[in-house]
């Protein structure tokens, strides 16, 4: 099975995905890390090259490479607007696509930054000084990607501001991820 975790930036896809993969004994991929490795550049360089559609096409090419790995896996998917490049990946048999959601306030609390070398750091003083800007940006992302993913990703999961371990436990329960679907030939195809 392949589990794709969608969501806006800073919702917690990577942390949740790593923990979920560990708990299930799956391989974990973070699309941002794979893009950096595949194109041999920092994320800062990547997001400043070409147009958004070109970058989404490149991200989708990396997702197709990840999909070639036949092991069970969890994939944290960076926000992609041009989903037509990845439609076929999500609609395959044995694929579960989940959009992780949370309130703008909870996402703001998780907000981190990265420098030009992709080193992640917290800067709460800066974050709170520009709270209005970031809250508006988060709200716009939630609205935009909610529309973009509405047809592609049928499973919506409210994180409720919980700790990542609690989110993982609820994901496992809600989607029965501890159940063996191999004999049933589960066809999640983006829905429970």
Ranges and model annotations:
Residues 54-96, 100:
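Glycine-rich phosphate-binding loop used to anchor ATP phosphates in small-molecule kinases
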Residues 11:
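ATP-binding Walker
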Residues 22-64:
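Conserved substrate/cofactor phosphate-moiety recognition/catalytic segment
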Residues 14:
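Walker A/P-loop
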């Amino acid at each position: 099975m392949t589990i794709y975790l969608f969501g806006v930036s800073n919702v917690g896809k990577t942390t949740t995905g790593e923990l979920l993969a560990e708990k299930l004994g799956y391989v974990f991929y973070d699309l941002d890390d794979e893009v950096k490795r595949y194109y041999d550049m920092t994320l800062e360089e990547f997001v400043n090259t070409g147009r958004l559609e070109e970058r989404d096409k490149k991200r989708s090419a990396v997702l197709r490479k990840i999909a070639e790995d036949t092991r069970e896996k969890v994939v944290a998917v960076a926000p992609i607007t041009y989903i037509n490049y990845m439609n076929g990946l999500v609609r395959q048999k044995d694929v579960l696509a989940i959009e992780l959601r949370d309130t703008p306030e909870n996402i703001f609390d998780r907000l981190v930054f990265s420098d030009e070398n992709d080193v992640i750091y917290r800067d709460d003083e800066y974050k709170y000084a520009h709270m209005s800007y970031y809250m508006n940006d988060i709200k716009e992302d939630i609205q935009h990607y909610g529309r973009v993913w509405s047809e592609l990703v049928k499973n919506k999961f409210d994180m409720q501001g919980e700790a990542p371990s609690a989110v993982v436990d609820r994901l496992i329960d809600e989607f029965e991820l501890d159940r063996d679907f191999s004999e049933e030939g589960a066809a999640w195809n983006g829905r429970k």
